[in-house]
Amino acid sequence: MKIGVLALQGAVREHIRHIELSGYEGIAIKRVEQLDEIDGLILPGGESTTLRRLMDLYGFKEKLQQLDLPMFGTCAGLIVLAKNVENESGYLNKLDITVERNSFGRQVDSFESELDIKGIANDIEGVFIRAPHIAKVDNGVEILSKVGGKIVAVKQGQYLGVSFHPELTDDYRITKYFIEHMIKH
């Protein structure tokens, strides 16, 4: 089984490392044609506006909207998966959620927190860097974790989204969960 990581920006190598530690093949996705070779896709963090522009430029948006591909979005990747972002439309419209950008503050307000993530573990380390939070969930969306009352992890069908950066820690259990419960099922 091959798991792709969208390689337009973000911690691509770190995500691939987590895929490999989970026992699977990880590949950097740089061209739209590569999407046909994978079983699931991770959308990494970075800057969400830049990520959307690059996805438009290289033709990823249309292809990803058409494909029925399991996807896992971290930080900016979560924003890209959302149906609504603050007071604007979403991008890929895969998760029935509304996201608020940078809701934990600026870069200097970055922090780490131990998270209890339903169905995965109660001791996951979350790295929050200019992180969004999920302000609203619609029917069919399962809340997996909160920090300070703010929703930071959800799943819906074959889509998983988190506000933080699991790839910046040595703990690959979230990636393994995505592969083994949302792709292999």
Curated annotation (Swiss-Prot):
GO biological process: glutamine catabolic process; pyridoxal phosphate biosynthetic process; pyridoxine metabolic process
InterPro entries registered for this protein in UniProt: Class_I_gatase-like, PdxT/SNO, PdxT/SNO_CS
Pathway involvement of the protein, from the record: Cofactor biosynthesis; pyridoxal 5'-phosphate biosynthesis
Cystine pairings recorded for this chain: none
Gene3D superfamilies: 3.40.50.880
Active site: 75, 165, 167
Keywords: Glutamine amidotransferase, Hydrolase, Lyase, Pyridoxal phosphate
Family: Belongs to the glutaminase PdxT/SNO family.
Protein name: Pyridoxal 5'-phosphate synthase subunit PdxT
Organism: Staphylococcus epidermidis (strain ATCC 12228 / FDA PCI 1200)
Phylogenetic lineage: Bacteria, Bacillati, Bacillota, Bacilli, Bacillales
Originating gene: pdxT
